From Swiss-Prot:
Signal peptide: 1-30
Official protein name in the record: Cytochrome f
Origin species: Chlorella vulgaris
Binding site residues for heme: Y31, C51, C54, H55
Function, as annotated: Component of the cytochrome b6-f complex, which mediates electron transfer between photosystem II (PSII) and photosystem I (PSI), cyclic electron flow around PSI, and state transitions.
Entry membrane topology: Single-pass membrane protein
Amino acid sequence: MRTFLKFSTLVSKGVLVLVCSFFLTASSNAYPIFAQQNYANPREANGRIVCANCHLAEKPIEIEVPQAVLPDTVFEAVVKIPYDKQIKQVLANGKKGDLNVGAVLILPDGFEIAPPDRIPEEMKAKVGKLYFQPYSAEKKTIFVVGPVPGKKYSEMVFPILSPDPAKTKSISYLKYPIYVGGNRGRGQVYPDGSKSNNTIFTASAAGKITAIEPAGKKGGYTLTIETANGESISEKLPPGPELVVNIGDIVGVDQALTTNPNVGGFGQGETEVVLQNPLRIQGLLVFFLFVLLAQVFLVLKKKQFEKVQLAEMNF
């Protein structure tokens, strides 16, 4: 039995590796979900989310949560990743396609994705078919989503379950921060440091371009640069970016050889939510009730006093 379980575990891991490998090559290994391979914590000490290491362009995102929530209740965290739905991005094969989106949500300790049986039907419809994966076994309050189609999920709804301090003594009724990162489109750099085909390519040496040849069936080009000392440098350019140089051009070090095809980008933000004590709300309501009653009594007392004064004047 143990042998069978070990074999099943190995098979599961193997399938997971194959799936991840597919996304790495076919889509982009710069989505938030792939940061898991290189970073134990997606949020660095300076507050920067590591997805920005691969998504070099900066784009805005938004997050909306209630100002305050009660313990052991389900609420929505809405992450908005806006972009022009008409634009196309360069895919790994050099062709144009729709943009995907991804997000990472960093919750405070005690907060979690609500179990399906706690999510209201109306909220389930907003969530759609999104799958929220924990960042790691150690980081159970960090969740990643994506890549998913941007046209359908540029606005993501996370169903969050708030903790109950009565059940978890380490939780208090306080204001808690929530951090989020979101990207649209593919990254420019892979986690190993190599460039994707969704970025600009520059010359590694100064000199004259002596040849531009197609790289093969998959597309792309091979440029030959002849330096001042007669050395020939080959520059391999993947399919996707468009050439901006011609044979005979003189280029300098780090001069652009292609356009920058990137139309996406990454952004991050933060917000706060108050875990509200129900007793405080009840106490506040009682206080308002006493204030209201006091106001009523004052009005009645004032009218009574005015009647007495009027009676004395008539007398």
